[in-house]
Amino acid sequence: LNGAYILGKLPTEGFQQDNGSLIHPTGGNEEELDNYIVQSGVDNPFYFPAEGYVRVGQGEIIGMAGLTTALSQDAYKVATTIVFTTQGIWALQISSDGQYSSVPPPFSREVCSNPESITMIDNGVFFVSERGLMLITDNGINCISEQLKGKFNDTDIDFLTYIKDAKIAYDYKNNSIWIINRSKLRE
């Protein structure tokens, strides 16, 4: 880790000494990095260079997902990491050296209200916001809750109420999503 060390006399205020010769800090030495992504060095998971700290906005990171989009039918896919924070959604690109590049302005100010709902699918990412069920694709963010109204005819629960605490799973084989809220299931 990056840091500075001194082998000399240090101030003893805020420290307590035990019977041995070690001085232990009494607390307050933790640092919270709620809006940072910390990356290890390429091919070395035990090395964390200073350029590997990427700040993502001002809010707390609540989830991440990968979004891959094909450039063309025969071209390679471009990978983007979608970062969900308490202040919006950020899209991070991978630079040529394998690290996340600088963070651009937010992709969207839409806030994910249920981190358990963040689900990657082929060419997209689902998540739940206060507006409803959202889908991120290479074309942007779309609210698809309106398209799903009436699909839950066998229940008297409003769709927006149902998805607030629901988990989402993607069935790759059948290309379908499962929206499950255990607290709303009938016995």
Name every feature range the model reports, one short phrase each:
Residues M64-E187:
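Beta-sheet-dominated scaffold domains
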Residues L1-L92, R182-E187:
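N-terminal beta-propeller domains
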